[in-house]
Amino acid sequence: MFLEKLNSATSRIKSIEEKLQDINLIKNQKKYSKIIKEYTYLEKINTKKIEYENILNQINDNKTILEKEEQQEMKELIKQELIDLDKKKENLEHEIKILLLPQDENDSKNIIIEIRAGTGGEEAALFANNLYSMYIKYSEKKKWKTEIINFNETELGGFKEIIFEIKGKDVFKKLKYESGVHRVQRIPITESNGRLQTSAATVAVLPNIEETEIDINEKDLRIDVYRSSGAGGQHVNTTDSAVRITHLPTGIVVQCQNERSQHKNKDQAMKILRARLYEFEDSKKQEQRSNNRKQQVGSGDRSERIRTYNFPQNRITDHRANITLYKLEEFMQGELDQLLDPLTIELQEQTLKSNNI
């Protein structure tokens, strides 16, 4: 199965090369860019395939030499070389298998993250703020740029909701598995009896979609303007600068009040709407592809409980890959890679099995 998929992928290179010679293709930049991207991807696989075939040839040659070799010392050297080559072969096979996985066209995109307080009242809102701070610190370590789009703050400094953008290399690829329910266990600052409480916040990671990537009919939108308000419902603007956009066919509602001008708030709201509509359409496609099979692992389902943060034990557990670390304090300071890297590997392994690669 592995070799079949490998040969099938590399066999497409020739037909793509022929397409690229078509002069008319360059006139359609969107189509041209898509084909170039596929060609680059297949060339990468082909390079690995050549490397893999070379290793197989070396293994076969060494086995032939070993059968004929009479000197014990040389035999031991050849055996050691075969062990090394087998290890290289195994590592290369894994690299190729990962490349053969269905490609996520959004991996190179910037993202919009939406964090919402779930069960737990004020404590859930404070935890939502903690998660926001964690992602900001992680972004700083990665040299990514961040910008708040909209937020709804509580009186104690928590967030009922915060929406922000992260721009940088491989942002979606790195953070796409963060979507889901994040559960926290700790003693809240609002708890006078010192009892442990369980609260939750929901995270949604959406690829930032350009205007050209999705068609939105103006007739399908209802746009309302109102005065923006701060924590506790206090008015912070005397003009109708806040914007609420309703997409009538889907019922998706987006509102933005963070910017001072109505025009900027509308632009930001449209940015969120594009991302949510894209996610809405994509989830429908995934549902069709799964043929009614439950595919929760790494699906980014917002209702999926993915992680527990236990502060008294300094413990963080990711339930999808059964990974537990006793480094919660470091994790909340933006040291996410110590969990994200093994998580990605485990989810890739699970995907390989489900795709029979």
Swiss-Prot record:
GO cellular component, one term: cytoplasm
Signal peptide: none
SMART domains linked: PCRF
Subcellular location: Cytoplasm
Record flagged with keyword Thylakoid: no
GO MF term list: translation release factor activity, codon specific
Residues recorded as bearing N5-methylglutamine in the entry: Q234
Post-translational modification: Methylated by PrmC. Methylation increases the termination efficiency of RF1.
Principal location listed in the UniProt entry: cytoplasm
Highest taxon in the source lineage: Bacteria
InterPro entries to which the protein is assigned, alphabetical: PCRF, Pep_chain_release_fac_I, Pep_chain_release_fac_I_sf, Prokaryotic/Mito_RF, RF-1
Region annotation Disordered: where it falls in the sequence: 282-313
Role played: Peptide chain release factor 1 directs the termination of translation in response to the peptide chain termination codons UAG and UAA.
Similarity comment text for this entry: Belongs to the prokaryotic/mitochondrial release factor family.
The protein's name in its UniProt record: Peptide chain release factor 1
Source species of the chain: Borreliella afzelii (strain PKo) (Borrelia afzelii)
